[in-house]
Amino acid sequence: MSSMRENKAESLIVELAAKYIAREAGRGTLITPLRADISPDRKNATIYVSVFPDDQGDHALAFLKRHKDLFRNSMKRTTRLAILPYITFELAYGE
């Protein structure tokens, strides 16, 4: 069961990911962050995204993996999380 602090951090990470993706992604594909899971030690976070159209999922995931360090640097500038997690992106199936 997640603590209130973890829930807040997960919500913040999803919100920041949505803003970053809206700013940096191309206009041909809709990438929407749905949720984030933070590890118990708060050092790693997985962001689950949905992609439309569905056949662009691999391209969108490749884009996100290329930009994960830039996104983490953006988070570093805009948040005051005690531990800034390393980010991985995964496609959300069936959500």
Show which residues each predicted segment covers:
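Charge-rich, low-complexity N-terminal segments
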Residues: M1-E95
